[in-house]
Amino acid sequence: MKQTKYIFVTGGVLSSLGKGIAAASIATLLKNSGLKVSILKADPYINVDPGTMSPFEHGEVFVTDDGAETDLDLGHYERFLDESLSQDNNFTTGRVYQSVIEKERRGEYLGKTIQVIPHIVGEIKDRIKKAGEGKDILIVEIGGTVGDIEGLPFLEAIRALRLEVGKNNAMNIHLTLVPFIKAAGELKTKPTQHSVGELRRIGISPDMIICRSEKALDRDLKDKIAISCGVEKNCVIESVDAASIYQIPLNFLKQDILSPIAEILDLKNLKPNMENWDSLVKRVIAPSNEVKIAFVGKYVDLKESYKSLTEAIIHAGAALDTKVELKWVDSEKLENMESSEVFKDVSGILVAGGFGYRGVEGKIKAIQYARENKIPFLGICLGMQLALVEFARNVLKLKDANSSEFNEKCQNPVVYLIDEFMDTNGEKQIRTAKTPLGGTMRLGAYKCDIKEKSLLAKVYNEVKSVKERHRHRYEANPKYRADFEKHGLIVSGESKGLIEAVELNCHPFFLAVQFHPEFTSRLEHVNPVICSFIKAAINYEDN
């Protein structure tokens, strides 16, 4: 069997430098050169997965087709690679220890003392190898920063794995910061030198260094980094701040990043076709038109919480040659503001998902304003649930209508806890209010049957069903379906009795979906729900 080649990506100096974007950009170039490529993110934190972590703590939780709750970098990987990944493409320290302890309890280690080396490191290596099966190249991003104590087993694993697979089958890329000191008026390389020194003390010598900076590096500075860090001169690549993350693969290509990669990994004919990508990026950066959308959410102070959704909107803008300006609206603050003043200058209102009661009434106000004023509206996940609550209160006149998530004793729970459903493997899942939170939601891609001649059918080009990804614990209560439909709120999508989408039949564009369309949107293949909403907003502005 052909040996998979590995590219290990580490980061130094500080976090949030963009290792995920760099890894995804290299993967894009390799894939467009005709290679079978995949990416894995190894996260050193102790949580089993990010599913129960606060958006303020971790940012978005990205969900794969098979229902894995993963790091937001997997979203970048999918959007750049234009491929669906799985739970094999992300694991944490918590997951590794959980697996090793379970094996120990089953007696699989035959009574041996369980240690970080070889058992924990061995488990990490096994997971990396599994993710690379059947691929020409596996890119492995190690989360965190070199020097973090929790990352040591992961660095030991990639050090050992490189020795195991041999020369020309693995390489190390290190991403560092080259800060610009305004007072001195120059870029400083010392943090990079120290970071590489720290990496070497662990036993890893980088083959390539990618330098994050707000300004371009001149040739002398690159040569200085190459000499002091022991890499070839053509292996010092700059990653300067860009107008769009989708420029990064093109910027890397201009610096001929593939030549040293090809030489180190013994690869031939790396000539990526990036024409379509380049065309779309130009429309992202310099579109012909512009439209403004209100983005209503409770985590608007941390935009990373909605990463996939904001990227999907960029994809739609590129497809429609339009810059989509987002007006961020804090749903909690909206509760005490005048809707007409907040939404007077927008051509569409998007109500995003979320958890917990804070900011809910503000979202309901936004939905009511969109419905009554015929402004294009899209509700996602909680946005759909609250569209039902708003309609029940203001049209059906059920003033105490609510979700049982926010009021367990309400008399009209138009949204309630899903107590029984079939998971993505076809197995029955039973839930109660006391079920532990971790990994117990309705997660992953489920088939949605679409009502003929509906707005949703038009959005999806008249197909009978689609598969979209979910992440929710509560669901529309079918007990109220007849009343909703009698008054014009139509169920246009469902999945084995669960309501997946609703729409208003007397509104230019009022669509709410239980699933997350943003999780399947890519630059080269935008999700139809997001694209149709932006198109409706453009039409609203034109008219």
Curated annotation (Swiss-Prot):
Residues of the active site: C381 (nucleophile), H516, E518
Biological process terms in GO annotation: 'de novo' CTP biosynthetic process; pyrimidine nucleobase biosynthetic process
Residues reported in the UniProt entry to bind Mg(2+): D73, E141
UniProt binding sites for CTP: S15, D148, I149, E150, K188, T189, K190, P191, T192, Q193, K224
Pathway noted in the entry: Pyrimidine metabolism; CTP biosynthesis via de novo pathway; CTP from UDP: step 2/2
Residues that coordinate or bind L-glutamine: G354, L382, G383, M384, Q385, E405, R473
Region feature Amidoligase domain, mapped onto this chain: 1-267
Domain of life: Bacteria
Pfam families: CTP_synth_N (PF06418), GATase (PF00117)
Chain sites annotated for binding UTP: S15, K188, T189, K190, P191, T192, Q193, K224
Gene Ontology MF terms in the entry: ATP binding; CTP synthase activity; glutaminase activity; identical protein binding; metal ion binding
Record's keyword annotation contains Metal-binding: yes
Catalytic activity: UTP + L-glutamine + ATP + H2O = CTP + L-glutamate + ADP + phosphate + 2 H(+); L-glutamine + H2O = L-glutamate + NH4(+); UTP + NH4(+) + ATP = CTP + ADP + phosphate + 2 H(+)
Catalytic activity, EC: 6.3.4.2
Cellular-component GO terms for this entry: cytosol
Coiled-coil region(s): none
Keywords recorded for this protein, A-Z: ATP-binding, Glutamine amidotransferase, Ligase, Magnesium, Metal-binding, Nucleotide-binding, Pyrimidine biosynthesis
Entry-linked PROSITE patterns: GATASE_TYPE_1
Domain Glutamine amidotransferase type-1: 292-543
Regulation: Allosterically activated by GTP, when glutamine is the substrate; GTP has no effect on the reaction when ammonia is the substrate. The allosteric effector GTP functions by stabilizing the protein conformation that binds the tetrahedral intermediate(s) formed during glutamine hydrolysis. Inhibited by the product CTP, via allosteric rather than competitive inhibition.
Function description: Catalyzes the ATP-dependent amination of UTP to CTP with either L-glutamine or ammonia as the source of nitrogen. Regulates intracellular CTP levels through interactions with the four ribonucleotide triphosphates.
Assembly: Homotetramer.
Record's miscellaneous remark: CTPSs have evolved a hybrid strategy for distinguishing between UTP and CTP. The overlapping regions of the product feedback inhibitory and substrate sites recognize a common feature in both compounds, the triphosphate moiety. To differentiate isosteric substrate and product pyrimidine rings, an additional pocket far from the expected kinase/ligase catalytic site, specifically recognizes the cytosine and ribose portions of the product inhibitor.
Family: Belongs to the CTP synthase family.
HAMAP family: PyrG
Descriptive protein name: CTP synthase
